[in-house]
């Protein structure tokens, strides 16, 4: 079966391989292998399992190896007990017999805290983790008498559960040393004597040892996780590994002169702090790093028992326990007075307040629900007051999705560790997001606040052929007509009904088969647990998340909205499976058409395996999606630095690597390279959409003679439009539309040189979408939100990075900051709706704000010419809200040289958008 791609080349339909992937589904369905995540299922049925890929594992193991010194212990085995003997203990035993070697039961010895592992369960107690004989006791000295400079530590990931796939003959021949570790040891000569050294004579292909470049043939295995091993006890030591875990091997080798074993380890990259935090590690360290920052989350009860007066009896939950939070907790009486007594007296609704604490301004947000009050305080330097309520609403909705209600979530004592983990992630994202997001540049505060606060998910447009294949694969999975998921298989009801699913790639939503409200519930959970940036930055070998959820669309259902129909009384579960950069979220329903769920159901391996098979089926589309991410931006974007005169830009700007520009310059033979820039773009130094810089001649107003003296961007005019015919400000749209059009060369206008291009090249050039009208492209940035579908489109991170310069990053920052204020004005202009009650009549006489804009002036900060003033570039940031026929919000940033109609831009962006 063949079809045609968007560029005209033949494309073999992916449907031809469906039978092959059906066989994969069958293999996974009827496989007897035990899932690796089975041991991490908690008592309440929830599961949070994260396993890194091979590359991330090597970085993690290298870090673990670097953080531990070479220290080994001796172990003496008996039938039911094991004795750990250190050199210090042996010396004491030889000197006197006053102290005997202390014997511990195997279960107590095995109780240890696992090192950073690829398998972690959310909120699981360390005492419930698999035990291990490989214990590193604090205060023990090295116990292997060898030269320190000849020792090296390497870490490998061992999984005893995979032994079932190893043939019995190989396991019997080499034992666990070959079957589990992959090391071939052939006793002979002096090494074959009882208790001799374990010399590595070979490595089994595809084994854990062969994947580690530090393990070489000829090395001697001295210790396994600080336990001295010989040919006599190696099988006993390896048999004590209870489950999948990292094991540190101490090897004796001959190092070349001048090369230390730690040289390669120190150069290994560090594991993302986000991964360690998701595993439940480093929470104390991260919390201590912001202990001096005033912040707190408290759940207070307004129902106080006057008979039994107790200290802090109104505090149901508090996080964190620090000195700064203690000062906020001490003034909780003010919070109770504002939100309870004052509200009862005035009848108003208190949503936020501000106070000074330790020379810092702190914003406090409130959410009152029945007789309970949720209080969240954050520093004003991290969260603006106009965005605080959006943050509170996001937290409340996420907690309701997870626990059904705030009272149910905070009142249950068992949820306290999970809530601590939740708020640890929450405050880390607000106060120090750079610790979680591994990036070369500091995350933009206002950019993340604005985009994360939108009631929508970031959408990535795909070519039609790839989009069709993705939707087809998801529809095949959601049909549930295979194996145990079919009613005809056993003649009984299936366990769950798949209500829908959504698919992410590197944090971008590429397919959605969920209703809007369910999509927002799922994405809020993924956003608060940082699952979207996790899949974007790292290749995940396996991610499995399972928990019961309470979709808000069903919790707040209204029977009058759909007469004659009511939602079934069912329970809902969220299944998230990640594989490499793909992540699929599935919403399941138990009850109604499916069997009723009893107790606390655990994840069913059949459903997990089928989602994995779906992601494996989509893996072949990886190259096409990456090509879309690396393609030039559509619509075309301009860099703000291109609109500065030549003196305001770096003199090192040269002709870039634009495909059309390269073909154009190859077709035309100019007299000199400098002539190319002057003939095409009027000035030397021009670059294409991803690197080409234009130098249009600006008018006197852009030359900087009448600009501001400071080097920071300044807002010089504000543009408002009330209703359909509201009047503008002093420099509003009236003066804006009458502004004379500035004539200067367009870096995207080829003119008569178009004739030198071939017919196909001309067609490709015409396919480039330009949103702005006229011959020039003056669009710098945009965000379009489709409220009905719950998505928004914006330039990708790659597209933003390509448009770098001295002014453009500051322009993007101003755009995000300004959009926060514009959207707040939009929300305040809408008819006021009490979030906890019925709709109330609006008091605004002129109707809702439909358009709002701010005019900025920007100057380069690296201006060194003292004789001439710095050039000034002016641009607009305009927001447009459309209520009819389809609710939309459109934010755009463009140069002031052209009078654009934002609604026309929004129409061009959304026209033909298939979701």
Curated annotation (Swiss-Prot):
Main localization, broad class: cytoplasm
Ranges of Polar residues compositional bias?
A: 128-139
- Pfam families per the record? Intu_longin_1 (PF19031), Intu_longin_2 (PF19032), Intu_longin_3 (PF19033)
Specify residue ranges for compositional bias: Basic residues. Answer: 104-118
Q: Cystine bridges: which residues? A: none
InterPro entries given in the database record:
CCZ1/INTU/HSP4_longin_1, CCZ1/INTU/HSP4_longin_3, CCZ1/INTU_longin_2, INTU, PDZ, PDZ_sf
> What Gene3D superfamilies does the entry give?
2.30.42.10
Lineage of this protein's species?
Answer: Eukaryota, Metazoa, Chordata, Craniata, Vertebrata
Region annotation (Disordered) ranges: 88-144, 688-738
Q: Where is the PDZ domain?
A: 165-253
Q: Tell me, in a sentence or two, what this protein's role is.
A: Plays a key role in ciliogenesis and embryonic development. Regulator of cilia formation by controlling the organization of the apical actin cytoskeleton and the positioning of the basal bodies at the apical cell surface, which in turn is essential for the normal orientation of elongating ciliary microtubules. Plays a key role in definition of cell polarity via its role in ciliogenesis but not via conversion extension. Has an indirect effect on hedgehog signaling.
Q: Which UniProt keywords apply?
A: Cell projection, Cilium biogenesis/degradation, Cytoplasm, Cytoskeleton, Developmental protein
Give a GO cellular-component term.
cytoskeleton
The subcellular location is: Cytoplasm; Cell surface; Cytoplasm, Cytoskeleton, Cilium basal body
Q: Which domain of life is it from?
A: Eukaryota
Organism, scientific name: Danio rerio (Zebrafish)
Show the PANTHER family listed in the entry: PROTEIN INTURNED (PTHR21082:SF4)
> What GO biological process, any one, is recorded here?
establishment of planar polarity
Protein's name in the database: Protein inturned
Name the protein family: Belongs to the inturned family.
């Amino acid at each position: 079966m063949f079809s045609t791609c968007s560029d005209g080349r033949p494309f073999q339909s992916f449907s031809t391989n469906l039978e092959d992937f059906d066989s994969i589904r069958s293999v996974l369905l009827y496989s007897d292998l035990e899932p690796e995540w089975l041991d991490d299922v908690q008592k309440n049925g929830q599961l949070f399992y994260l396993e890194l890929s091979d590359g991330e594992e090597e970085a993690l193991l290298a870090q673990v190896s670097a953080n531990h010194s070479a220290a080994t212990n001796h172990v003496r085995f008996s039938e039911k007990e094991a004795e750990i003997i250190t050199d210090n203990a042996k010396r004491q035993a030889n000197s006197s017999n006053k102290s005997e070697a202390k014997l511990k039961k195997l279960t107590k010895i095995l109780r240890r805290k696992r090192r950073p592992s690829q398998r972690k369960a959310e909120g699981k107690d360390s005492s419930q983790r698999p035990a291990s004989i490989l214990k590193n006791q604090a205060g023990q000295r090295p116990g292997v008498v060898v030269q320190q400079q000849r020792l090296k530590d390497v870490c490998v990931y061992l999984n005893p559960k995979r032994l079932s796939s190893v043939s019995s003959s190989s396991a019997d021949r080499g034992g666990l040393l070959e079957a589990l570790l992959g090391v071939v040891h052939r006793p002979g000569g002096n090494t074959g004597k009882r208790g001799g050294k374990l010399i590595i004579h070979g490595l089994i292909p595809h084994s854990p040892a062969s994947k580690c470049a530090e393990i070489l043939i000829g090395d001697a295995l001295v210790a396994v996780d600080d336990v001295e091993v010989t040919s006599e006890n190696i099988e006993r030591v390896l048999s004590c590994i209870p489950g999948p875990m990292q094991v540190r091997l101490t090897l004796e080798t001959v190092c070349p002169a001048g090369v230390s074993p730690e040289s390669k380890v120190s150069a290994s990259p560090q594991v993302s702090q986000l991964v360690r935090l998701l595993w439940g590690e480093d929470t104390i360290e991260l919390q201590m790093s912001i202990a001096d920052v005033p912040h707190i989350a408290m759940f207070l009860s307004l129902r106080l028992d006057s008979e039994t007066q107790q200290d802090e009896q109104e505090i149901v939950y508090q996080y964190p326990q620090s000195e700064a939070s203690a000062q906020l907790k001490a003034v909780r009486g003010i919070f109770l007075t504002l939100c309870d007594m004052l509200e009862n007296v005035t009848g108003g609704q208190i949503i936020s307040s501000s106070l000074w604490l330790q020379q810092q301004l702190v914003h406090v947000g409130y959410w009152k629900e029945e007789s309970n009050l949720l209080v969240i305080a954050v520093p004003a330097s991290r969260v603006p007051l106009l965005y605080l309520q959006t943050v509170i609403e996001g937290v409340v909705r996420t907690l309701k999705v997870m626990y059904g209600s705030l009272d149910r979530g905070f009142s249950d004592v068992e949820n306290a560790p999970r809530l601590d983990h939740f708020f640890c992630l929450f405050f880390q994202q607000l106060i120090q997001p750079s610790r979680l997001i591994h990036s070369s540049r500091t995350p933009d505060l206002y950019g993340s606040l604005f985009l994360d606060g939108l009631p929508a998910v970031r959408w990535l447009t795909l070519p039609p052929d790839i989009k069709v294949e993705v939707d087809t694969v998801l529809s095949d999975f959601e049909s549930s007509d295979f194996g145990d998921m079919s009613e005809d298989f056993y003649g009984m009801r299936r366990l769950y009904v798949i209500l829908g699913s959504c698919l992410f790639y590197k944090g971008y939503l590429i397919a959605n088969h969920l209703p809007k409200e369910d999509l927002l519930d799922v994405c809020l959970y993924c956003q608060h647990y940082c699952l979207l940036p996790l899949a974007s930055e790292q290749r995940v070998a396996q991610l499995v998340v399972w928990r019961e959820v309470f979709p808000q669309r069903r919790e707040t259902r209204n029977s009058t909205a759909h007469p004659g129909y009511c939602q079934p009384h069912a329970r809902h579960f969220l299944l998230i499976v990640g594989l490499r950069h793909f992540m699929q979220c599935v919403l399941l329903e138990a009850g109604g058409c499916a069997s009723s769920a009893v107790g606390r159901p655990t994840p069913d391996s059949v459903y997990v395996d089928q989602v994995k098979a779906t992601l494996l089926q989509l893996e072949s589309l990886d190259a096409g999606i990456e090509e879309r991410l690396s393609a030039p931006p559509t619509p075309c974007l301009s860099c703000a630095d291109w609109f500065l005169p030549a003196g305001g830009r770096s003199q090192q700007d040269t002709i870039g690597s634009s495909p059309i520009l390269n073909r154009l310059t190859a077709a035309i033979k100019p007299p000199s390279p400098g002539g190319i820039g002057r003939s095409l773009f009027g000035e030397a130094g021009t670059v294409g959409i991803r690197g080409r810089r234009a130098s249009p001649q600006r008018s006197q107003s852009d030359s900087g003679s009448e600009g501001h003296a400071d080097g920071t961007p300044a807002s010089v005019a504000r543009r408002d439009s009330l209703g359909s015919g509201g009047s503008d400000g002093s420099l509003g749209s009236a003066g804006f539309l009458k502004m004379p059009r500035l004539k200067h060369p367009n870096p995207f206008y080829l003119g008569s040189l178009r004739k030198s291009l071939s017919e196909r090249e001309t067609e490709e050039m015409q396919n480039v979408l330009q949103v702005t009208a006229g011959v020039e492209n003056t669009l710098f940035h945009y965000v379009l939100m489709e409220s009905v579908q719950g998505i928004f489109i914006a330039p990708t991170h790659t597209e933003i990075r390509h448009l770098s310069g001295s002014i453009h990053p500051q322009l993007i920052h101003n755009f995000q900051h300004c959009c926060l204020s514009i959207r707040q004005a939009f929300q305040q202009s809408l008819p006021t709706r009490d979030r906890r009650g019925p709709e109330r009549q609006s008091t605004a006489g002129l109707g809702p704000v439909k358009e709002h804009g701010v005019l900025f002036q920007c100057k380069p900060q690296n201006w060194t010419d003292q004789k001439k003033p710095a050039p000034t570039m002016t641009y607009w940031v305009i927001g447009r809200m459309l209520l009819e026929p389809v609710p939309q919000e459109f934010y755009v940033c463009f140069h002031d040289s052209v009078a654009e109609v934002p609604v026309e831009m929004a129409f061009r962006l959304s026209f033909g958008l298939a979701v």
